[in-house]
Regions:
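Electropositive polyanion-binding surfaces
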Residues: 2, 12, 16-17, 24-26, ...
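Gly/Thr-rich phosphate-binding beta-strand-loop-beta motif of the actin/hexokinase/Hsp70
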Residues: 5
Length: 216
């Protein structure tokens, strides 16, 4: 009735008034972004293992001898695509390698349901809300250097003179990334000035604890 006071129940407290992350927390709440995974999905992710021998026996192609590299923001935590480039005479062989998530996420599993419901990972100013648990997104499905990983690869043969696509092939593969480059480092490799490369590597390496030694 009109004389009864309205009642309610607090279901969630979003940050605090002095929290530096309050605005981001509000964005997460406003758009109903899911930040937690179900126990079943977490259990499925934790149970995933990399079986290189099994993958090769089932038809994955072994291309671990290729020089493969990733290019991502310097603060990226998951690396889901990689490249390889080989020049042979008048042809350029370009390889595009995408982390094979399907090798770990069976159709209609709890993980599959989480991924379909979320649709993508969400990158915010101070955090990443992953599409899959970190056991997959940051580990088994992340193409980090010196680690064997399952991938879906596209081999593209280009004519060197004009970049015309001459042939392509798509196949599951086992790769091992050789290098992780930032955008600045990759651009410095493309640019002719050698000091750009040196400056980029020094700038990007410092936050990760690189130590510069004086050889004099």
């Amino acid at each position: 009735s009109r004389n009864n006071a309205a009642t309610g129940k607090v279901v969630r407290v979003i940050g605090a008034g002095d929290s530096s992350n309050l605005e981001i927390d509000l964005i997460v709440a406003q758009h109903k972004l899911e930040t937690e995974f179900s126990d079943q999905a977490l259990d499925e992710a934790d149970a995933c293992v990399l079986d290189v021998a099994g993958a090769l026996a089932s038809g994955y192609r072994d291309i671990r001898d290729r020089f493969v590299f990733t290019i991502d923001p310097v603060d990226a935590r998951d690396y889901d695509d990689a490249l390889s480039v080989e020049v042979e005479g008048e042809h350029v062989h370009l390889g595009v390698h995408i982390a094979d998530v399907s090798g770990y996420v069976p159709f209609d599993s709890a993980l599959d349901g989480e991924a379909r419901r979320r649709g993508c990972s969400v990158y915010l100013v101070d955090r990443v809300i992953p599409m899959l648990p970190e056991a997959l997104s940051n580990q088994l499905c992340s193409l980090v250097p010196a680690r064997e990983r399952l991938a879906m690869s596209v081999d593209i043969t280009l004519r060197k003179s004009d970049g015309q696509v001459l042939a392509y092939e798509i196949f599951p593969s086992v790769i091992a990334s050789n290098a992780r480059l930032s955008y600045d480092q990759a651009q410095a490799l493309i640019d002719p000035a050698p000091h750009d490369l040196i400056d980029a590597f020094r700038k990007e390496a410092a936050p990760f604890g690189a130590v510069e030694l004086d050889d004099e």
